[in-house]
Amino acid sequence: LMCNLLEGVVNSGTGVRLRYKYKLTNPMGGKTGTTQQHADGWFIGVTPDLVGGVWVGAEDRSIHFQNLANGQGANMALPIWAKFLQKAYADSGLKMSGRPFDRPAGISKRLDCDETISEAEAKEMNKSLREDEEEFY
């Protein structure tokens, strides 16, 4: 379930730049982060073969980026992760598979919304999902 949540960050959230700007198409997830007063930006990335993180900031807490746009993890740390991941996938010696995340046994998909919404409302909500997209809860 956690991998599914983190994939959402990369497929349609603050990490989507990995897909369109850096052309990374393999299964992956991530989480961006920014600290108070734009002092740190970070990105944690996960693939089925690799987990890593990038932190951009300073140990001296009085040093910080001038504005949120510069201090965001999606703007400062994510590009570093993207370049690293591009090189990792290009290196055949690392054997990065590009396989999907493993789905643990015992996880099932249940679409049981009738206690909170009508069947017509559920069908209308499902129209917004791409045909190949599934959400797990």
Where are these regions (language model features)?
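A penicillin-recognizing enzyme superfamily signal
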Residues: 1-127
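Extended acidic low-complexity intrinsically disordered regions
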Residues: 125-137
